[in-house]
């Protein structure tokens, strides 16, 4: 999913990209929306949310997401300078 950018270019910005032996979680932003992409062996999830906070909250209910990957993804996201907990 690419988001429109002035001048006809599409820009997707990675806010967080967490990888463990159990899978991967990415938070992407552009066009005023946040995309949550999570995947692991035998499963995958993609959803779009109005805010980063909504996407982070929704991560808790992604089916088959291992607890350790969930915790690491949130920890990585909170360490990002653009995340202030109220996005």
Question: Whereabouts are the PLM-identified features?
Answer:
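A short, structured beta-strand/loop element
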Residues: 24-50
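Short, well-ordered helical secondary-structure segments
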Residues: 12-14, 21-23, 37-39, 52, ...
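Short N-terminal "domain-start" leader segments
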Residues: 2-31
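Mixed-charge, Lys/Arg-enriched low-complexity segments
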Residues: 2-8, 41-87
């Amino acid at each position: 999913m690419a988001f429109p950018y002035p001048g006809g270019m599409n820009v997707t910005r990675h806010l967080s990209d967490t990888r463990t032996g159990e899978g991967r979680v990415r938070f992407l932003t552009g066009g005023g929306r946040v995309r949550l992409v999570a995947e692991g062996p035998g499963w995958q999830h993609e959803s779009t949310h109005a805010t980063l906070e909504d996407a982070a909250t929704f991560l808790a209910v992604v089916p088959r997401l291992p607890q350790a990957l969930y915790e690491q993804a949130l920890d990585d996201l909170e360490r990002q300078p653009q995340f202030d907990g109220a996005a």
